[in-house]
Amino acid sequence: VARVSLLDREQVLPGESSAAQLITEDPVVASVDSCFILRTYSPLVTVAGGKILMPAGERPKNRQMKAALLEYLDKLSEEPPLKERLLALINYRGIITAADAARMNEVSLVELMRAVSPFEARAEVGVIRGGEAVLLSKRKIDELGETLTKALALFHGEHPERKGMPAEECAKVLDLQETKFTRELLSLFEKQGIVKFADDRARLADFEPFDEELFSAN
């Protein structure tokens, strides 16, 4: 028994199709591209059918998330190859663990990382490898990078004598829970030329701290 939640309209007329979410009363086993039929409970009549695009479904919390989900499902409905499926998922989620991405696409971690490698080489996807691998979309990297550079500009203005913002403080600025992950992200930002990261501190790429000793010597 399940409820059907349409994602892009109020009703589906005969001959039409729509993206929908099946909300089951009890857990069920499903896999990508599995077909299904829908029947009314009483009387027992077949009313619709479809194909599963995303077994591990999630309910969008707002209009923006719903629009992003619909865009992702539209891409999946085209039956793209694995590489394009992964890129669409990463762009939809913004940030996702490699393990979750592999599970959602029913592939091994080795297969997933092999498929992601070309996107990483072209800087279309960021990969954090410290501990559990995490994948970030280019949009998410740009968003986090912009937030951090604005915070660093203010920090340097208030503390020109300091070598940079501590990683723990960067984590708070970026609203990240784990400092270890933040350090790996800062290292990625450094590779992309967004910041300099040394001695567990981040600074803008063109910032040089005020050298008090040199000033005193002169």
Where are the model-predicted features located?
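C-terminal effector modules of nucleic-acid-centric enzymes and ribosome-associated factors
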Residues: V1-N218
